[in-house]
Amino acid sequence: MTIKIIEGDFKSATGKYALLVSRWNSFVVEHLKEGALDTLRRHGVSDDDIEIVYAPGAFEFPLAAQKLAASGDYDAIVALGAVIRGGTPHFDYVAGECTKGLAQVSLATGIPVAFGVLTVDSIEQAIERSGTKAGNKGSEAAETALEMVSLLGKL
């Protein structure tokens, strides 16, 4: 008896991708966007198959992602933002609702929503994760979207 293994790959990147980008903390988020674009392009996705949608902030992502997924125009959505902890509970509310909302959109629609939203304690951590010491989480989210499109095509 042989165990069957099913997994996504990057052999033939196909599909149409929406980058959902937050305007808040744009000094960080623009680097996430550039990382995601670079990754999609390096895997063969044409610029004609990428659309960038700007939303005010991460709290607004679930509704925007729901509309994008419901349109039927996209094979995956890559959410890119940065929620930086401050001195009030605001961070917890925004980060939690964004995370839960995006997961609900993905489950309800069957469209992968890759999570490239930084939830960090400081501006320094955000900068590290947007292209310096800790890599580029926008690039990683784009890779996740590519792999999920491939995987779902095999299931």
From Swiss-Prot:
SUPFAM superfamilies: Lumazine synthase
Protein name: 6,7-dimethyl-8-ribityllumazine synthase
Catalytic activity: (2S)-2-hydroxy-3-oxobutyl phosphate + 5-amino-6-(D-ribitylamino)uracil = 6,7-dimethyl-8-(1-D-ribityl)lumazine + phosphate + 2 H2O + H(+)
Sites where the protein binds (2S)-2-hydroxy-3-oxobutyl phosphate: G87, T88, R129
Active site per database record: H90 (proton donor)
Gene: ribH
Pfam family, one: DMRL_synthase
InterPro entries: LS, LS/RS, LS/RS_sf
Enzyme category, top tier: transferase
Binding-site list for 5-amino-6-(D-ribitylamino)uracil: W24, A58, F59, E60, A82, V83, I84, F115
Keywords: Riboflavin biosynthesis, Transferase
Family named by the database record: Belongs to the DMRL synthase family.
Subunit comment: Forms an icosahedral capsid composed of 60 subunits, arranged as a dodecamer of pentamers.
Lineage: Bacteria, Pseudomonadati, Pseudomonadota, Gammaproteobacteria, Cellvibrionales
Domain of life: Bacteria
Alphabetical list of NCBIfam families matching this protein: lumazine-synth, PRK00061.1-4
Function: Catalyzes the formation of 6,7-dimethyl-8-ribityllumazine by condensation of 5-amino-6-(D-ribitylamino)uracil with 3,4-dihydroxy-2-butanone 4-phosphate. This is the penultimate step in the biosynthesis of riboflavin.
Metabolic or biological pathway, per its Swiss-Prot or TrEMBL entry: Cofactor biosynthesis; riboflavin biosynthesis; riboflavin from 2-hydroxy-3-oxobutyl phosphate and 5-amino-6-(D-ribitylamino)uracil: step 1/2
EC number: 2.5.1.78
GO biological process, one term: riboflavin biosynthetic process
GO cellular component, as recorded: cytosol; riboflavin synthase complex
Residue spans crossing the bilayer: none
GO molecular function annotation: 6,7-dimethyl-8-ribityllumazine synthase activity
